[in-house]
Amino acid sequence: DSIVDEEVSQRLEQVQMAEREIVLEEFREGLGLKGNTLAFLRSQYKDSYLVYQISSKYLFEPILDVPMADYSDGEFVTDEKTKLKSFEVDGKSVTSHVVDVSKYQGDIDWKAVKNYGIDGAMIRAGIRGYGSGEIVADTNFDTNMKNALAEGLKTGAYFFSEAITVEEAKEEAEFLLNAVKPYKVKLPLVLDLEMIDGDDGRNEKLSKEEMTKVALAFMKEIADAGYQAMLYGNIRTISEMVDLTQFEDYGLWFAYYSNEIYICLLYTSDAADEARS
């Protein structure tokens, strides 16, 4: 029996080594075809994990049980002149192209933005400083809002949050509501929630549960005022900062810069550069 057991063990070890070599070979071939490690890992775990990279570390977050879009690269058409992507159904675009702007874009020629093929604009109303914690208005908000509306663009607005309490989140929502009150805003009002690198971010000290509670307080204030509330963030926002399953009643705006569709809505920062003066 011991001889049989030894032979079985040897055979199992040989099979395991052979399978390991097959996996490694597939990995090497995949890296060669995809061109980079991150793209390959995403292709391998697309149905089970969100994969992202922080410095030299690859992180894997289980995909949550939330409603998902079923877009694929093949269903997007890219305009050769503007490079804007459109999602088509039966050969017709069902996409709205929207830019987001703040004072950092300077003086914007909104007529040029409109002519470029842009349908709307998300305009920054203000921020809470991640160091001071003070709310600061975006100095170009009113100018951008008035001029975008004058060109017939739909508009929405966003606020960069560093709230660490429910009370601060409500204060930010009230600030945003007051900012848009004079205007006919048809697009969502957005909580911009991002992780600040380093130790400067106020909200980095919060747990995911605490941050989720704070963000939801903002959302509720906006929704109760009759607007569509939306969360803005990148992969780290939805995987590390908040529990995404708690936001199914609200809009979600992903920041993801790549030519390859992954979980992408915001896909370029250059579309309307030529409209800046």
What do these predicted ranges mean?
Residues 3-116, 124:
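Boundary/entry segment of secreted carbohydrate-active catalytic domains
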Residues 60-67, 84-89, 121, 154-157, ...:
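Generic detector of short, locally flexible boundary/turn motifs and exposed helical patches
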Residues 90-94, 114-117, 149-151, 182-185, ...:
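Extracellular/periplasmic catalytic domains that process cell-envelope and extracellular macromolecules
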Residues 95-115, 122-214:
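Substrate-binding cleft of extracellular glycoside hydrolase catalytic domains
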Residues 144, 218, 268:
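Aromatic/hydrophobic pocket-lining residues that form π-stacking "cages" and hydrophobic walls in ligand
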Residues 152, 180, 219, 275-276:
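Generic helix-packing signal
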Residues 185-265:
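Catalytic domains of cell-wall/extracellular-matrix polysaccharide-remodeling enzymes
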Residues 267-276:
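Single conserved hydrophobic/aromatic residue that forms the stacking wall/gate
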